[in-house]
A protein has these predicted regions:
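Acidic/histidine-rich, surface-exposed loop or edge segments in extracytoplasmic proteins
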Residues: 33-45, 87-89, 197-201, 367-369, ...
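Polar, glycine-rich mid-to-C-terminal structural blocks
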Residues: 464, 476, 483, 487-539
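Bacterial N-terminal signal peptides
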Residues: 9-19
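Bacterial N-terminal signal peptides that target proteins for export
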Residues: 1-11
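Conserved functional hotspot residues or short segments at active or partner-binding sites
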Residues: 134, 139-140, 144, 164-196, ...
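Cleft-lining beta-strand/loop regions that shape enzyme active-site pockets
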Residues: 41-51, 209-216, 231-253, 262, ...
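Extended, domain-scale alpha-helical bundle/helix-rich regions
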Residues: 123-253, 264
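PDZ/PDZ-like domain segments forming the peptide/carboxylate-binding groove
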Residues: 48, 64-65, 100, 104-120, ...
Length: 675
């Protein structure tokens, strides 16, 4: 669940696959709707068939897919769908079972009329605004608690969107002249029409789609609304979306290594990916204007058409034409020839550093997701390599594992990463819709690191990150430090996204996971042993703020592995080779936790900058009504990482307390021997 919402700026990582997705994937049709629905119902943890509740959710989500800011549709237009009676909903179900999706066609017709109305309003608004002083006042938020009651209210909301858009770009480029203002209005309209054209069944260039394309996009929107109506984490994806997700999970893609942004002057280079062909050419910089691709002038092309040109799969070489303005305002034009190749996204995988301590170090590892690929890249391997690199410097006396920005990834990697700090034992218990229970185990009889360990978490730590944090907390081998709780995603999804041979792409919630204590992280998240608030602490972030989340429950503990999911032969093998070496629950850190908390509280109370941050967070809490759930303000740049500093201090306390305990144990043993 990348989870932080972007405000206006949308970045596109140009990932060019060898095989064109559009060409290789068949278009959807109405018959696929039933096929996909049946598949998802057969897998889902709770929902097995269409119901009035599912229908109401479908209509609501279909509407919100189009009008999330409530700036197109009137309340009187949407209420018949949002408040549909059970009787009417059963009639919709009967029609859908007969392959009749006319209810959604009528809803789409209503959306098309709303688009025409909005385009007329935008035209009137922009003429008026261009003739007067800019920009006027805008409300601080895009959140609307209700759909507009009147067309005047709609017009005001559209005007407000334009003003916010203008103010966003004004901080990034010169908009003083009438010509520049006209350009920003044109860009605003272009971005809205990009979404509107999908519902008007128009191509990027404004031409009407072919019938098969119309049927495809209509079916795609229904399936997206349907999948999301099952629960908050079930989703249906287009092939393009699935491809992007797969690259995100595998931390690699094939391309030229540029990130594009559509700005006032055209398509800009927003970022050059480290280690990619663009960076290695030494010729491309951020803010360069992309004006040509393989000799094709881009000036009059829609942004999607620019992306399509880059994604063409019939050549390995791409020639980019770029324009650059120097510090004196002088333009220059140049060409760069780049060869597409695989690029590893190393920056978003892991980062490491250390603090010197005596003759050794305290290691710091920040892990941003749980990933693995066919090329041997994995989060487990990267952490092992980091620990080895620390040990080459000197003894590794303690470790901080930072999962504050980690929103999950592969479950198998969560088990393996947990296993680096545990011996044999159950890491995750998974329970599925029909009651089946499975145990995911670490079967390596010796931990890779067993010293003082702090796991840093935040409200943004989710899914696989929560498994690792709670598993290590259950066994008592780590102290959890950070926000009061983590995100709270404790559900399991089956997905076809990583299956390149799949003809449809979805993820569907099939179960919930629990750790060895029998606790689930669903809704409640992982509770910190020592609360050190992060930047995210004051915001409304978490599973509890999503629509249609599953409820939490509890299973019996599995610290003593029951082996009930194994066949007789495997069970005998595990009883001989695995059970004698089970990880024991460590009680020492729990015993000294009051001391660790007291020391931490005293340090933070004496840190004026940390106290200043806490006061600022109180101000943020006072304006949460203007922010949608699961979103945050842009994080300010700061040189101080108070949570990491305190995590290291807690590790230092742990080292001292552990050494003190050993001394006391040795003294007690000597006294016993002497007596």
């Amino acid at each position: 669940m990348g989870i932080r919402q972007a405000a206006i700026k949308i970045l596109f990582l140009i990932c060019i696959s060898i095989t064109s997705l559009a060409a290789s994937q068949p278009l959807l049709n109405s018959e696929d709707i039933h096929r996909v629905m049946d598949r998802l119902f057969s897998l889902h943890i709770e929902n097995r068939e269409l119901s009035p509740t599912i229908i109401r959710r479908c209509f609501k989500l279909y509407i919100e897919q189009f009008d999330s800011e409530k700036s197109y549709l009137l309340e009187r237009e949407v209420l018949p769908y949002l408040q549909i009676s059970d009787e009417a909903a059963f009639a919709v179900i009967e029609r859908m079972n007969n392959n009749d999706f006319s209810d959604f066609l009528m809803l789409n017709d209503m959306i098309q009329r709303a688009i025409a109305r909005a385009q007329n309003m935008r035209h009137s608004n922009t003429i008026q605004m261009l003739d007067n002083d800019w920009p006027g006042a805008a409300s601080p938020s895009a959140i609307q608690s209700h759909f507009a009651y009147s067309e005047k209210e709609l017009a005001d909301r559209l005007k407000n969107r334009l003003i916010r858009f203008y103010m966003f770009h004004k901080t990034r480029t010169d908009l003083s002249s009438t010509e520049r203002k006209e350009k920003i209005v044109s860009l605003f309209d272009k971005k809205l029409r990009r979404q509107e054209n999908n519902y008007l069944f128009l191509k990027a260039n404004g031409a009407k789609m072919e019938r098969k394309q119309i049927e495809h996009y209509f079916a795609l929107r229904i399936l997206k609304a349907f999948a999301k109506s099952l629960d908050t984490h079930s989703s249906f994806f287009s092939p393009e979306e699935a491809h992007e997700m797969r690259m995100s999970l595998e931390k690699q893609f094939e391309g030229v290594g540029v990130i594009l942004f559509e700005g006032v002057d055209g398509v800009m280079i927003s970022e050059v990916v480290k280690g990619g062909p663009a960076e290695q050419s030494g010729m491309i910089q951020t803010n360069d204007l992309l004006v040509e691709i393989d000799g094709n002038v881009l000036e009059f092309l829609a942004f999607e058409e620019v992306l399509d040109l880059l994604k063409k799969d019939n050549r390995r070489e791409v020639v980019l034409g770029l324009r650059r303005i120097d510090d004196e305002g002088n333009p220059s034009f140049f060409h760069v020839t780049l060869n597409k190749r695989p690029i590893m996204l190393n920056e978003s995988r892991i980062s490491t550093s250390f603090e010197k301590f005596g003759d050794g170090v305290i290691g710091k590892i920040s892990l941003y997701s749980f990933y693995e690929s066919n090329d041997g890249i994995s989060s487990e391997k990267d952490i092992k390599d980091a620990i080895r690199s620390f040990q080459k410097i000197g003894p590794l006396y303690g470790l901080v594992l930072d999962l504050r920005e980690n929103s999950g990834g592969f479950l198998s990697q969560a088990v393996k990463v947990s296993g680096l700090f545990l011996s044999n034992g159950v890491v995750v218990i998974s329970k599925y819709g029909r009651g089946e229970i499975h145990y995911l185990r670490n079967i390596v009889g010796r931990s890779f690191f067993n010293g003082p360990l702090v796991v840093l978490t935040s409200k943004m730590s989710a899914s696989a990150a929560e498994i690792v944090a709670q598993a290590l907390q259950d066994y008592g081998v780590a102290i959890i430090v950070g926000d009061e709780r983590t995100f709270g995603k404790g559900s399991i999804q089956y997905q076809t996204v990583t299956d390149e041979g799949a003809d449809i792409f979805f993820k569907v919630t099939v179960g919930k996971y629990y750790t060895a204590s029998g606790r689930t992280t669903q809704i409640e998240g992982v509770k910190a042993d020592i609360v050190v608030p992060t930047y995210y602490a004051p915001y409304n972030i978490g599973e509890r703020y999503l629509e249609y989340p599953l409820s939490p429950d509890r299973l019996d503990p599995a610290f003593i592995d029951p082996l009930t999911d194994l066949d007789a032969k495997t069970k005998r093998l595990f009883q001989d080779k695995y059970m004698p070496y089970l990880q024991r629950v460590v009680s020492f850190w729990k015993k000294v936790l009051p001391v660790l908390r007291k020391n931490s509280t005293q340090r933070l109370a004496q840190n004026p900058q940390f106290q200043k941050m806490l006061r600022h967070q109180e101000q943020i809490r006072g304006r949460l009504e203007f922010l949608p759930p699961n979103s945050v303000d842009e994080m300010p740049a700061t040189a101080n990482d108070y949570q990491m500093e305190e995590a290291v201090n807690i590790v230092l306390d742990m080292i001292y307390l552990e050494q003190q305990s050993r001394v006391e144990s040795a003294q007690a043993e000597e006294q016993l021997t002497g007596s």
